[in-house]
Amino acid sequence: MEMMVHGRRDEQYGGLGLGLGLGLSLGVAGGAADDEQPPPRRGAAPPPQQQLCGWNGGGLFSSSSSDHRGRSAMMACHDVIEMPFLRGIDVNRAPAAETTTTTARGPSCSEEDEEPGASSPNSTLSSLSGKRGAPSAATAAAAAASDDEDSGGGSRKKLRLSKDQAAVLEDTFKEHNTLNPKQKAALARQLNLKPRQVEVWFQNRRARTKLKQTEVDCELLKRCCETLTDENRRLHRELQELRALKLATAAAAPHHLYGARVPPPTTLTMCPSCERVASAATTTRNNSGAAPARPVPTRPWPPAAAQRSSA
């Protein structure tokens, strides 16, 4: 009876362990009462399982009854009396009963208080990124506003010219590709445009002219490069043919003919200037060989004294 009162008190306080000392005393007293009780009758119902259990502060144990009822009574006490804060933690046992009890009870006040403030790491990161993105968006909006102010409060539109205006601008550009401020203002008044528009048109026209000239120069250089490449290939082929012909002629011609060395014939041609130089040298050698030699006197001159006496 005392054990039942103890169990109800534990259930009333939610297993907070307030009856630890009382459980020790009641456990010992319950064991003594079981020893003094007479054996149960055949027609009587077995005693409830709560009376077979005691509390020793560290876990549940059965009273001094028979051994064949000890283990079953201990398991029954574990199932009936739930004291999660006072019993030991079994790492091999899943907390199914506690989960079921918590689900049946519903969310507690502490959980309801924590739900609005609780958030996952992803939500925390998203909130931080949102806070960081807000200044960047504000900065972009401010930059766009400043651009609008600089551009006069609106986007710059492309200048549309009539045929007459374009013709006048083209003629003026052919005469002068650059304009001074006075010419620019006069042309703007003539065409009913702004000086800035005239200046921009001339800048674009100069850029287009330069680009076209660059393209023309590039095409000309490409053609020159192709021509030089073809000429270089032709010269290489001729050089290889001449070398092969020279080697073949040198191998076929005899080296000595009647004791005199005969130079191998060659088909190499010389430029006109080289031929003129060679012909002039040959003519000089031939003329010097055909001219008669000057006679050398063999009789000595008479002495000067004999000539004076004869005179």
Swiss-Prot record:
Instruction: Tell me the compartments it is located in.
Output: Nucleus
User: What are the inducing conditions?
Assistant: By auxin and sucrose in primary root apical region. By wounding in leaves.
What this protein is called in its record is Homeobox-leucine zipper protein HOX1
Return the InterPro entries for the record. HD, HD-ZIP_Homeobox_LZ_Class_II, HD-ZIP_N, Homeobox_CS, Homeodomain-like_sf, Leu_zip_homeo
The species this protein was found in = Oryza sativa subsp. indica
Against CDD domains, the record matches this protein to: homeodomain
Which top-rank group of organisms is this from? Eukaryota
Q: Which family does it belong to?
A: Belongs to the HD-ZIP homeobox family. Class II subfamily.
Gene of origin? HOX1
Database matches in SMART domains: HALZ (SM00340), HOX (SM00389)
Cite the residue spans of the region called Disordered.
29-69, 97-160, 279-311
